Amino acid sequence: MNKKNFMLGLGAFCMGGLFMGCQNEENDPTFSNHNNFKGNYVIPVTAGGTSYLLTAESLDEGKISVIENGKEFQDQISYWIFYDQNYFFGIKYNDGSQGTGGCYYLDANNVPQKKYSYTFNRFTTYGTWGDNVITVSTGDTKQTDSKGNAAQGFLFNYLNAKNGTTSTNQQDILAENFLGNGEKVTMAGFVEANGKLYTSIIPMGMSHYGVNTWPDKVLSQDYVATGTGGSGSGKYTAGQIPSTQYPDNAYIAIYSGSNFDEEPVIATTDKIGFACGRMRSQYYQTIWSDDDGNLYVFSGGYGRTATQPAADANLKAKVQGTLPSGVVRIPAGSTAFDEYYCNLETMSGASGHPLFRCWHFWAISARS
């Protein structure tokens, strides 16, 4: 895949264990005999449950077809991750089960070939950091409170893109009280820029462990469930706060090292709500950097969906957000938000609907 040099732009639409296995496939890549890639665009698509990888010389005109321009994949792919000039990864989200996927390269005939197959712990978001493709979810740790409730922690998976090895964090990294407000959190998306890693931190309410350990962080007993309710990833039981008490704040964790063991710097703003898209337990990335290293943080204002419970529910009240979809910025070289703000629902040409997901679009220019 002899190309790159990204020209970046932003586009928005409304809307701990080791890896279980890693298998080295035959036909390892020999990058010295790769042809120049035909076309400046690589386009993953899914139709009817089948995944394809297409190539195109232009997105401005003409048509594109899987015939002579595409490769059908036997494996179902939920997300594609492009890593430098040599590899691209396809990973499959399997609801609450383990994730699966593969590492691919283009052979001398520009046909995708699989280098590695892998199975790994369930994930809720993903990205790249250094030599690794990373995924993360949250789950129970070995740490418990006086009542035996397990503390929630981050479960990181690292797939090394250079040699195919896999690993995970070897010590518990708590997701409890991560922001100092008693709530458990998760992460949504990863951005490498300015020699640092940025990730959006999503507050998720207080677990049983959190309520018992930091009772002073409970803003109102009305927010604590008195029985079972909700469904799926939103299911809760008595004694926990099932949704955040801080829906109108966004948080970005900034890491300067090479792993998540370090203490990050937390940038906070009250101009927008927490920054992510969400579908069930998947948290979609809504933070992106531009060519100059400025980080743009998008929020759909999801806190507004925390509607008040019915009168007979096992939960008396929730904190409902008020902020609309918006975008703010952390300038390159800074660890704090600046004054930039844009209301995405009232800007010129806006539909008035909230943002669901956003993507970072780029064009690719071939090397000379």
Give short role names for the model-derived ranges.
Residues 1-41:
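Bacterial Sec-dependent N-terminal signal peptides
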Residues 36-47, 84-94, 130-147, 195-204, ...:
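Short beta-strand elements that form the blades of beta-propeller/WD-repeat-like
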